[in-house]
Amino acid sequence: MTSSENSSVSNPLRTDVLIVGAGPVGLFAAFEAGVIGLSCQIVDGIERPGGQCIELYPDKPIYDIPAVPSCTARDLVDRLVEQCRPFNPPMHLGQRIERLDPLEGGRWLARTDKGHTFDAAAILIAAGNGAFVPQRLALDEAARLEGRYVHYRVSDMNGLAGTNVVVAGGGDSALDWALALRSVARHVTLVHRRSGFSATDSSVARLRQAVAAGEMDFVVGTIARLNSPVGPLESIEVRQIGGSVCLDADQLLVLYGLVADLGPIVNWGIAIQAGRIVVDTSYYESSRPGIFAAGDIACYPNKQKLILCGFHEASLALRKAYNYAFPDKKRVHVHSSYDAKLAERVAAVHP
C-alpha cells in the first residue's frame, strides 16, 4: 500500500480524506473510510506503518482491544494493515505535512516536506502524540558532525563497513543495531549510562553473549566529548564514575529513542490545549471546519487515551467528513454484514 504516486503544487493528489498518521487509529480510519465510500491518502513521518506502537513498544502485549484477549503491538498493526487491504489506501511514509492551506469551496491543500501535495475535502489528524523525532546528543560538536560521522538512524548498514562504530543507547534499537553491525564494522562498542537495559530479554542475552565472546565491547558511562581535531571523528570520551575512558571511533550511532513533537501542526490555525487538538464530541471536529482529530492527539473532557477510543472517534469523524466530500449526497447507512460491495472487496483479498 506504500504509494509511489508523485504530486506537485500544480498537480496535487485529490482525495476525499487526508489521514495524517499511520498508527492504529489512522489505519482503522483508512478502512472505515473505504467502508463508507470515501477515498483517502495516508501520510506519516515514520517510514513504516504503526506509529508509536511500532516505534516504542512493538513487542509489548496489549490486552484491551475488543475480542482480542492479547496481542503484541506489532501483531495489532499487522492485522490493521491487513484489514485495509480491500481498499488498498495509498501510504506516503517518511514524510510529514508541513503546510495546510484552505482552498476555495472548503477544501484543503496539504504540502509535505518532500514536496508532495494533496487536495482534500477533509483532514483527519491521527498523529498520536505528534511526529517522532530522534532524541539527539546534547553536545555542540554532535550537530556539526551529524550526517557524516554522527547518525540517528541507519539507512545503509554497508556505509559503516570497515569502521570503528560506537552505538549509544540501551533500548532494543541500540542493542539490535550493535549486534547487527558486527558483520560489517571493524569493531563495535555499545555505550549505555548503566549496566541494565530497557530491551527485551532475548536481545540482552545476545548482547552479553557477544561481549563474552569478544565479538564487541560494552562500556558503562555517558558520552562527554566527541574528538574530531582535523574534521573526521577520531575518538569519543565516555565519562564514568571516578574517571573517563577514550574510545577509538570513526562513526557514532545515537539511539536514545524518539520524542514526540507536534511540529507544523501548531501552525495550522487550530485550537490546541496541552499539546493536543481541541475537538467537539459530536464528530471530533477541530476549531476549523473540515479538520478532525482522533486518537491520543484529540483533546476533550474526560478523554481516555485508549486505542479503542481512537477507533470510535475516527469512525464518527469520517461520517461528518463524508458531508464535506459529498455535500449534496445523503449517505445511506448499511451494516457491514449486509454490505455487498464490502463483502466483494474482502472476498477478493481473502478468498
From Swiss-Prot:
FAD binds at D44, Q52, Y57, I97, F132, D296, S337. Disulfide bonds: none annotated. It comes from the Bacteria. Its EC number is 1.18.1.2. Keywords: FAD, Flavoprotein, NADP, Oxidoreductase. Its cofactor is FAD. GO terms for molecular function: ferredoxin-NADP+ reductase activity; flavin adenine dinucleotide binding; NADP binding. It catalyses: 2 reduced [2Fe-2S]-[ferredoxin] + NADP(+) + H(+) = 2 oxidized [2Fe-2S]-[ferredoxin] + NADPH. The keyword NADP applies. Binds 1 FAD per subunit. Homodimer. Belongs to the ferredoxin--NADP reductase type 2 family. PANTHER family: THIOREDOXIN REDUCTASE 1-RELATED-RELATED. This is Ferredoxin--NADP reductase. It comes from Burkholderia vietnamiensis (strain G4 / LMG 22486).
